Each structure stands twice: as C-alpha cells, then as structure tokens.
C-alpha cells in the first residue's frame, strides 16, 4: 500500500522527496520471496557480511514466523529494500532478538512487556546509493508497528557502524554488547528505546514517521492465521484501532 504519513511531509524533511513514490507490500508469494532472498544476498555480499554461495539466496527459519510481517519497499514499482517486523509478546517470542539476547528479553516478556523487533533490514545496493533517504522510509515500518501494537519498547539488532543512525532517529540506547549473528561475519548489539517516552520527540524531528490509523491497519491486518487477532485482543483496552 502507499505510505500515508499524516500530515503530508515537506520535500525538505528526511524521506519527503521519495515519500509519494513508495509502496509498502507484504512479501507473501513464492516469486516475491525469491526476489527478496536474492536482494538480501546481494546486499549482504556487498556489505561484506557473507561469503559467496551457490544458491545466491539468504533466508532463515523466522521468515514464516507467525509473529512476523515481512515487507518489501517499492519505489516506482521496483523492490528497493525490505524489513521484517516481529511483534514479541509473552505468548509469541520467535525472533533472532530473543534467540541472541534471551537472557535480557525473556524476563521482561515474562513481566508482560511488548516489543517490536525490526529485523533483516536490507536494501538493493544500487538503489541505496540512488535513494539516500530509503533507510528512513524502511525503518519507518518498525515505528508504525510500535504505534499499531501499543508496544512498550522498540528494539534493533545493530552492527557497530549503524548504531549512530538508530541513536539519531529513534533515540535508541545500547542495552547489550555485540554478539554473533548466525551465518553473518559481523556481530550485532541490542539497542532499544521506550516508545512512549521518545514518541513525540521522534515525530517532531522526523515527520515522515507520522501515520494514520488506516495506514497502520492496512499494513498489519491479515487473515492467513490467528496471530493478529490474538494480539489485537490482548491490546484492545489501549488500542488505537477502532472497533468495527
């Protein structure tokens, strides 16, 4: 679906010039998944994160996790980047964040916290150079998920060279030192921010992060399994989603 920040952003703010050319689409068909896995391979190989492989594809067991939404970000109809958004709840904990940093996250989940874990952020190397604001429009999906699911905390697994970006945009802080990520040559640290505390500051600094309730519903509502209904039921008392 077309991105729908509200109000419309100026061309002079981050992401504004690209905003009206972007579509967010769930990656669901075998053809779309293959294109995504190939793009991941090219991006990771270009970034020195993996060695060449015969398959030229990168996928993992969490791609079809019931608590994950995998989006493609399309500019003028072309797949340019992707983000997989995990919703972590006491009942649903499947992600690399809990696999790598379970000693930190599981006790908090046991206390009832809700996390949004944006993972597998990749961009087509040529498109990343062509569209310097593409990262902002990609990570925006994680921010919208925090709003939609009434999350307590936004997470990020981040390599050292990208930590400054997450501090600047989402006011994230490092809460765990780098650990090895499966099948990748560089370690990742665990970063986090309290969503309700930073929300207004982020919106003021980056208006591109604004959204409508309609946009969030269109992005995260799906019928192929019961997870969405279970999550919305859990959050219903504080939800921003109108009841039908």
Question: What do the predicted segments below correspond to?
Answer:
Residues 56-64, 161-164:
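Beta-rich nucleic-acid/ligand-interaction surfaces
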Residues 10-60, 70-74, 79:
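Short amphipathic alpha-helix that is part of the acyltransferase structural core
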Residues 75-107:
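Short, His- and charge-rich active-site/binding loops that engage polyanionic ligands
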Residues 61-71, 92-93:
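A short helix-loop-beta-strand connector motif used in the catalytic cores of GNAT acetyltransferases and
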Residues 184-244:
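Charge-rich, low-complexity intrinsically disordered segments
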Residues 1-19, 236-244:
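Short acidic N-proximal helix/loop "leader" segments that mark the beginning
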Residues 95-193, 197:
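Acyl-donor binding region in acyl/amide transferases
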Residues 60-65, 181-185:
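A short beta-turn/loop motif at secondary-structure boundaries
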